[in-house]
UniProtKB/Swiss-Prot annotation:
GO molecular function, one term: nucleic acid binding
Family of this protein: Belongs to the UPF0102 family.
The protein's name in its UniProt record: UPF0102 protein BCAN_A0183
Superkingdom assignment: Bacteria
SUPFAM superfamilies: Restriction endonuclease-like (SSF52980)
Pfam families (UniProt xref): UPF0102 (PF02021)
Amino acid sequence: MTDLREKKRIAFFRGHSAERLAAFALMLKGFRIVARRYRTRLGEIDLIARRGDLVLIVEVKARASFEAAQFAVTPQAMRRIEAAADLWLQRQTDRARLSLRFDMVAVLPRRWPKHVPAFFTAGHYG
């Protein structure tokens, strides 16, 4: 196996592990996970969580530091996440009642995941 292929495989499994840990942390806060790795033609959402009428669109980043996790979510990624969220929302029968929030969960080595509510807002990527 090539070095590049091995690195991609490790990153893939690290991402899955981080998403599982982030989902668990959100469930402990009372959220229900309604989708994992929700893919659309416009982008992918790592986690979609819901508590009542509040829906979290969650980007999960596994990095060595919190700062690295923050900078890993680029404006381009935010646009793709928002576009995918719009498609998801269109498919919800109760969409008129729902409030969307774009959060991030940073998964750091040997630490509990750090949940950042309202990491970005729709249309504001800076």
